[in-house]
């Protein structure tokens, strides 16, 4: 299993945090452009999913300007809730195709960042408050750093929870730093259908090599994990409210 230095150098953490804040605000603003058509889609399932995420069902991270940029969730919808062969090119792909060679430097940068998006399942290992969370990427089977200021205050070491999310890499590749795409969906122990429970067992115990998914398999895995996470959150809300 690959390891990470856990950003021991304070100067490195300062650089990573500044880049995280810049890039997060930039992607949130730009992605809003592709979220709007989804809200008015003729596809009922897509429209319902877009409204559910857009209206804040998932936990949101606050920004310095006081806004919650719900539109980031389009990156998650791309893999978790869209079937591209039925709906057409995904919003992420449309953005990349439209702005990948744009004269607008910011739009071009966002398109480049989006092109490296990937879905995964994370297990938190250790929190560094005010910066982020050291996690095990269960699909890549390696440690990584999730730069997440808000999350760093709430994760509990050894809690055993698994989170489904999308990741965007940034900064020096050797740092193995990522930011999530706006939602960390919890998969708690109290609600795990057999298929996902077995998936987690396979990832954590029996596999000795990283799990490699074909492009057409990623949406299936993401859809299962996110459906499970959404239903689990709903169950928790019903049970404990």
Put a short name on every predicted segment.
Residues 130-135:
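Short aromatic-glycine-enriched beta-strand elements
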Residues 180-183, 193-241:
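C-terminal effector modules of nucleic-acid-centric enzymes and ribosome-associated factors
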Residues 166-176, 183-184:
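Short, charged beta-turn/beta-strand-edge "cap" motif at the junction between a beta-strand
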Residues 1-62:
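General N-terminal leader/first-domain-start detector
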Residues 36-118, 122:
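Accessory interdomain/linker segments of ATP-dependent helicases and helicase-like nucleic-acid enzymes
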